[in-house]
Every structure is written in C-alpha cells, then in structure tokens.
Amino acid sequence: MSKRDYYQVLGVPRTASEDDLKKAYRRCAMKYHPDRNPGDAAAEAAFKECKEAYEVLADTKKRKLYDTHGHAAFEHGVGGGNAPDMNDIFGDIFGNIFGGARASRRGADVGYMVELDLEEAVAGVERQIQIPTLVECTHCHGSGSEDGHVETCGTCRGSGQVRIQRGIFAMQQTCPHCGGRGVIIRNPCKVCNGAGRVEDHKTLSVKIPAGVDNGDRIRLSGEGEQGPEGVPPGDLYVEVRVREHPIFQRDGDDLHCEVPVRISQAALGDIVRVATLDGEAEIRIPAETQSGKLFRLRGKGVRSVRSRTEGDLYCRIVVETPVNLTAEQRKLLEQFEMTFAGEDARKHSPKSATFLDGVKSFWDRMTS
C-alpha cells in the first residue's frame, strides 16, 4: 500500500522538535479518533496513519533511519519494531507467480498538501512547490558501493527472492541475506551509507485544475521518491486544502452567502447588489421579505471539475436591526411603532403570530 510522507501526515516540517511532533500527534489523534468518528472507515485509517507516523518520528533511531532511507528503511523488517505491511508479505509469498515481486518494486509515493484561496480553487492555478525526496546518490551513482563494486548475493543468486518448501507448498519470499536487493555491498558508499539514495529537495510546477475542492488529490506520476537500484520512482500526490472565505461557503458546486438588508428595504422591497466570484449581480427583493429568505442566482457557483457544469449561488437575506441611531431616527421609529397601537400583531408580523398561536396552544393544553 502506498504510504504518505510521515511529516506530511502529521503536518510538521522535517525540522520539527519532539514537542512539535507530540502536539501534532495529539491534534491528529483527537480529530480522527474512532470514538469521535464511530463507523467512519476513513477516519479510522487516518488515525492509524497518524499513529504509525508518530511511532517512527518520535523514536530518535527510527527517525534517523526514516530521514535517510524513507519508508524503505522499514520494509521487510529492517529498522526493527514496525510490523510489515500485509501487502508486502503477500507480495513476497506470491509475487513471483505474477512476474516477481522484485521486478514490481518502485520508490515510495510522496504526499504534499497545498493550500488555496477559494478564488484559486474555482479558477485553477499553477503553483511552484518544493518537496523533500530521495534521489539517486551521485557519489556512487545509485550502486550503494564506495568503489562501485557489488557482489551478487550467493543465497538468492541475484533475484532477491528465495524459494522455501513447506510441505507440499513451494513459496517465494524475500531473501533474508540481502534483504531483497539481490546484491551484497562490502564497502558501503560514505555519502549514502549504502542506500544508493540521498535526501534532497526538488521544485515542481503543479497545474491545479479549475473547480477543485477540499480533499481532492492530484497525481503526478513518477515524481515521488527514487526507487532503490534504479527501479522506477513512486508518484507524488498533491492534496488540496481550501481556506475559509470571508463571504462564501461552498457546498459541492454551489456557493452560499448572507446578504444583509435594512428593515426598510425588506419591508418596502428594493434592488440590492451582491458579490459573486466573477463580479457583482443584482437581486430584486420583493416587499415584505422576511429574514432567511433564499434567492438563487443560477450559474454563479463553481464550475465542476468533473462534469464542467456550473453550480448556483444561494443568497440568504438577513434583515439587520439598525444600530447607532441618531435622535431623529429614534424618534421616527418610535412614531412608526405607535402606528401599530391597537393593531392585531397577526396582521403585520406573521412569525410573531405563529409564535403567539403556539404559546396559546401550549397553555391551553397545560390548563385543560
């Protein structure tokens, strides 16, 4: 199974201190803990991923191994303490039936998170990102040997696999002598310590398509970690996180916003201008509009990244109570209020009428 970079999982830089790691793990654990997300398989998987990342990075020796060799440091039991991936186990046993496990090996996948403004997510954007990765050691040219000399493993004869007979079953598994590499290095490279790869950073240009949303992932084939002994590199997965917008809330391809209006506008009707992602639009508010009324502007939402259809913009009216009144404004409002004296509230205030009817019905039931 492809694994994300442990630092990316916890959301910390590679220079993070022990306290930073502990705080990041606590946040992650609280967010994805199964007790907080009952029945959520995705949250359970994320919790296990956070736990695995912290167990490695919180251990000084394991962290040093991981920083040098990446996930490869813990494959096939190397590094100690970590349980092997079940997919790797079955790959060791049955891999050669389908062409050999060693032939299918490649570098680890890498995860990266990019934050966008809503406008960038809607319109699409090109971003330059710098990612930590493992690349071929230029000192030994990936051989892992200081003098360039490697010996073919005598146990597996260079295949990286050994055949084991268990009763009537013959199985293939990773060679315990060379760890699946197929070669023995007597004089390890002083730069990469025999790994054949070193840690580096590379800058990539990522084109993020219009319409992406929170959690969407973009796959860049072959931009992950370089595999050992020249095998193909893994992939890079760029995950999108969209920042909160001060005006709009996104729901799929639709957008929602609140439009404040004055009492007089709501009572008498008016035309108000509202912001959209591509400028402004007008809403005609009829007289006697109540707070909470929704108006839909078709096609003013987000263009879907998959179907290319456009969502809508829903504007919710919020009737505001005026503040900081002048003496004259207060006097006019008092005069306006006096015009309701003796009037039935049901005539002018439909919600008040409903409320009063509910109160009366409640007390009638209580006293009957």
UniProtKB/Swiss-Prot annotation:
Name of one Pfam family that matches: DnaJ
Intracellular or extracellular location(s): Cytoplasm
Cofactor: Zn(2+)
InterPro entries reported in the protein's UniProt record: DnaJ (IPR012724), DnaJ_C (IPR002939), DnaJ_domain (IPR001623), HSP40/DnaJ_pept-bd (IPR008971), HSP_DnaJ_Cys-rich_dom (IPR001305), HSP_DnaJ_Cys-rich_dom_sf (IPR036410), J_dom_sf (IPR036869)
GO CC annotation: cytoplasm
Domain J: 5-70
Zinc finger (CR-type): 124-201
Residues reported in the UniProt entry to bind Zn(2+) 2: 153, 156, 175, 178
Record GO biological process: chaperone cofactor-dependent protein refolding; DNA replication; protein refolding; response to heat
Domain of life: Bacteria
Cofactor mode of binding and number, as noted: Binds 2 Zn(2+) ions per monomer.
NCBIfam families xref list: DnaJ_bact, PRK10767.1
UniProt domain comment: The J domain is necessary and sufficient to stimulate DnaK ATPase activity. Zinc center 1 plays an important role in the autonomous, DnaK-independent chaperone activity of DnaJ. Zinc center 2 is essential for interaction with DnaK and for DnaJ activity.
Known role: Participates actively in the response to hyperosmotic and heat shock by preventing the aggregation of stress-denatured proteins and by disaggregating proteins, also in an autonomous, DnaK-independent fashion. Unfolded proteins bind initially to DnaJ; upon interaction with the DnaJ-bound protein, DnaK hydrolyzes its bound ATP, resulting in the formation of a stable complex. GrpE releases ADP from DnaK; ATP binding to DnaK triggers the release of the substrate protein, thus completing the reaction cycle.
Protein's recorded name: Chaperone protein DnaJ
Gene (name only): dnaJ
